[in-house]
Amino acid sequence: MTYIVIGIDGGGSKTHAMVADEQGRTIAETVGPGSAVRPGRAEHSANVIAEVVRDALASCEMTHVTPRVLSIGVAGAGRETERNELWQALVSRDLAAELVIHSDFSIALDDAFADGPGVLLISGTGSVAFGRGPTGATSRCGGWGPVCGDEGSGAWIGRRALSVVTAAADGREPETALTGAILTAAQINETSDLIGWAANAAPAQLASLAPVVLSVADAGDLRANAIVSLAVEELVLHVRALARHLFGDERAALPIALSGGMLSRGTTLRKRLEHRLKSAVPGGQLRTDVVVPARGAVRAALRILGEVMA
């Protein structure tokens, strides 16, 4: 009998599922809406994940098959309370024989470095850094959520842009091309309308403004460039903190991997970050291959499958 497993990467803006056989060969992939778990919102995340699992099985005509292991890495699940709430919301749905929930950063670290040392920096809707030192010890930095932290993330950049636009409307900041660009992206006509828009905006909606900020920065706008520069510095601080904590020195030789939509290859944020890391973390060895967190979730599922079948 051939067994299948499913690996899930659930972020704030999208959820990526990979179906694989017991040898780890990819059978199908699908993408759905964001499923990041927020306090008190586990049912919503579970609904999205369940739908993505069904879509993934349908895409490879395996709706009649029960996956042996469903391995889920989801933003917000680094906190035990939210992780337990999500597990409770999912376990009754009988999506798989075995269900395991990880943080999004742990599955990404697995894909980036397997069992080896390194620091992974993620910037998507939110941001977090996670690392493993030479001794095997692990630690995280950031990931405090959209209200308290997530510095250098898409949502954080979007919030900073709103502050700049409203300050420019007051005359506290110089005029900026961000004003027109942000109003257009938010599909509103007046700066005053931003109050209502922002009050109802989810982190993913704030993050949708980040590409606009990067585009305006590329066109030479000083305020947009200042936001991007500050985002870079905030992200660098995450890496430096873990370098000190796990490797003893921010100048130590350490592998670094970048992940998340804001740090996709070719983005302005990634290019500036790569340049800054050369001086800020001189011992850093930047990985150029693409990190696929869902693939890390599949790898975790295969380990569990091996234990179950042993």
Language model features with spans:
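Short beta-strand-loop/turn "lid" adjacent to the catalytic site in phosphate-handling enzymes
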Residues: 38, 56-95, 100, 110-113, ...
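Glycine/charged-rich beta-loop-alpha catalytic/anionic-binding loops adjacent to active sites
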Residues: 30, 68-70, 90-94, 136-145, ...
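Glycine-rich beta-strand-to-loop/alpha-helix junction loops that act as flexible
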Residues: 71-77, 123-125, 254-265
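Conserved phosphate-binding catalytic cores of ATP/NTP-utilizing and phosphoryl-transfer enzymes
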Residues: 1, 97-120, 137
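Active-site nucleophile and cofactor-binding loops and adjacent substrate-binding regions
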Residues: 99-107, 122-123, 151, 285-295
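ATP-binding/phosphotransfer module of carbohydrate and carboxylate kinases, centering on a glycine-rich
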Residues: 1-65, 111-117, 162-310
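Glycine-rich phosphate-binding loop of actin/hexokinase-like ATP-binding domains
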Residues: 116-172
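Short, active-site-adjacent cap segments at secondary-structure transitions
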Residues: 78-80, 107-109, 128-129, 264-265
